[in-house]
């Protein structure tokens, strides 16, 4: 069946293609949680699945699908590639190819020896081992623990509030010339109403600079100067939509840097290999290559930094002619910046796919990074979180180690076959897997805990 349009809106054609080409390994016993994980993986478009089975004394229950492959096939968008193997036998095969998997998902692993062996294999493979999502559910509680082997880069974070890259404090010559074509002193109110608010904000910044303000611009300063340059046209100006927008978005002019600085800090302070064979995920390597390319461009031109303009302009009150002229300036500048990146890549003989390059340049401000944790798969054994400790005790020793004070709080730990919570975690862990595969949205960093008794959740870094 065809994928829903919603999926393409969430992570785009590039993300969906990554899902279609990915391979996911699910490790664990036959539980409703594992069934939910498989179902959600197939519905997302992942059609290459491996199940490393763990024998478990606990019955899978009547809700578990009798023939997993047969029941999953109708949900798949193409021929389902599916294999089952025994985990213990697989762990004893030194040549087993773990690197072929995009993500490894552990579901309700209750054997300490299996976890220890898998952790040792992961340590030996180093950065070539895929990301691991370890999840466990008991009663009304559960956790998801992400362990990365290499730095994970998010190509498009999709923040809740979109911040446009307008370069109000760092305009290029063509944009300055465009702003200078508007002489407010010779305008009437009708002509003024057709000016984009970004032009008004840049005129305010220019006036502040002429007045000797070389420090950080504040919102109050912007609003005060806006009144100084606009009110001479008449008191009715304050009712014009573009003036109202300029007041509302005055804060956009108060940022020295329109794009996030954390990526520059990463490149400045972090030593990570730019050798392709050291990376498990090609996209991570390509995004790193692009970040290093930006650094090289800045160095070659004696600039503090170089950030490609995204070229996206928000809707605003303006005449059609003024808006189209402004939009074209941003689009032309974005193409020029992208060309500079392509030329630098060619000189360095680095290869990056065109789709990744275009997405990177058009959403540079949304690029994020997550560093591998200092802990490994065994990190869940050495925390001071009472709920996680209780879950781990149930998972590996089948007995919660809780104090008298915690006994009432964790009363829901021993509820068997809580399918609703397992279904929730099946969706949640696959959501994190999709984030890792598509490089869209920011994954958890790196522990997610859920308490179904009081309906609360939290993330921690361990």
From Swiss-Prot:
Involved pathway(s): Protein modification; protein neddylation
Listed Gene3D superfamilies: NAD(P)-binding Rossmann-like Domain (3.40.50.720)
GO cellular component, one term: ubiquitin activating enzyme complex
Positions of disulphide bridges: none
A Gene Ontology molecular function term of the record: ATP binding
Superkingdom assignment: Eukaryota
Keywords of this entry: ATP-binding, Nucleotide-binding, Ubl conjugation pathway
One BP annotation, GO: protein neddylation
This protein's record includes keyword Transferase: no
The keyword Disulfide bond appears for this protein: no
Family membership noted in the UniProt record: Belongs to the ubiquitin-activating E1 family. ULA1 subfamily.
Description of how the protein assembles with itself and partners: Heterodimer of UBA3 and ULA1. The complex binds NEDD8 and UBC12.
Protein's job: Regulatory subunit of the dimeric UBA3-ULA1 E1 enzyme. E1 activates NEDD8/RUB1 by first adenylating its C-terminal glycine residue with ATP, thereafter linking this residue to the side chain of the catalytic cysteine, yielding a NEDD8-UBA3 thioester and free AMP. E1 finally transfers NEDD8 to the catalytic cysteine of UBC12.
Designated name of the protein: NEDD8-activating enzyme E1 regulatory subunit
Lineage: Eukaryota, Fungi, Dikarya, Ascomycota, Saccharomycotina
Name of the gene encoding the protein in the UniProt record: ULA1
């Amino acid at each position: 069946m065809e994928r829903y349009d919603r999926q393409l809106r969430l992570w785009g054609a590039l993300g969906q293609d990554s899902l279609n080409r990915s391979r996911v390994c699910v490790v664990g016993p036959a539980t409703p949680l594992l069934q939910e994980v498989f179902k959600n993986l197939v519905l997302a478009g992942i059609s290459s699945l491996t199940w490393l089975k763990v024998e478990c004394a606990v019955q899978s229950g009547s809700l578990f699908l009798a023939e997993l492959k047969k029941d999953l096939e109708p949900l798949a968008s193409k021929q389902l590639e599916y294999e089952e193997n025994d985990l213990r036998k697989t762990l004893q095969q030194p040549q087993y190819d773990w690197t072929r998997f995009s993500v490894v998902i552990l579901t309700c692993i209750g054997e300490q020896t299996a976890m220890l062996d898998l952790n040792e294999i992961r340590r030996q493979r180093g950065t070539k081992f895929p990301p691991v999502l370890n999840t466990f559910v008991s009663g009304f509680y559960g956790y998801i623990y992400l362990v990365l082997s290499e730095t994970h880069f998010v190509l498009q974070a999709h923040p809740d509030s979109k911040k446009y890259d307008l370069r109000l404090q760092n305009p290029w010559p063509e944009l300055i010339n465009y702003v200078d074509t508007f002489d407010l002193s010779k305008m009437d109110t009708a002509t003024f109403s057709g000016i984009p608010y970004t032009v008004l904000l840049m005129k305010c910044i220019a006036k502040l600079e002429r007045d000797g303000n070389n420090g950080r611009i504040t919102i109050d300063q912007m609003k005060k100067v806006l009144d100084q340059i606009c009110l001479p046209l008449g008191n009715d100006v304050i009712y014009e939509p573009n003036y109202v927008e300029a007041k509302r978005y005055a804060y956009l002019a108060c940022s020295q840097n329109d794009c996030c600085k954390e990526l520059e800090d990463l490149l400045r302070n972090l030593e990570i290999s730019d050798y392709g064979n050291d990376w498990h995920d090609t996209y991570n390597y390509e995004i790193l290559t692009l970040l290093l390319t930006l650094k090289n461009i800045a160095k070659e031109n004696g600039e503090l930094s170089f950030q490609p303009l995204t070229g996206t302009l928000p809707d605003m009150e303006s005449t059609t002619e003024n808006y189209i002229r402004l939009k074209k300036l941003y689009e032309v500048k974005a193409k020029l910046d992208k060309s500079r990146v392509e030329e630098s890549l060619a000189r360095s003989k680095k290869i990056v796919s065109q789709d990744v390059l275009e997405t990177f340049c058009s959403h540079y401000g949304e690029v994020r990074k997550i560093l591998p944790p200092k802990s490994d798969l065994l990190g869940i054994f050495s925390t001071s979180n009472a709920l996680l400790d209780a879950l781990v005790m149930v998972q590996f020793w089948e007995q919660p180690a809780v104090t008298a004070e915690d006994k009432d709080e964790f009363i829901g730990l021993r509820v068997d076959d809580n399918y609703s919570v397992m279904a929730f975690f099946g969706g949640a862990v696959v959501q994190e897997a999709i984030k890792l595969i598509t490089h869209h949205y920011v994954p958890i960093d790196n522990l997610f805990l859920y308490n179904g008794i009081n309906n609360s959740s939290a993330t921690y870094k361990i």
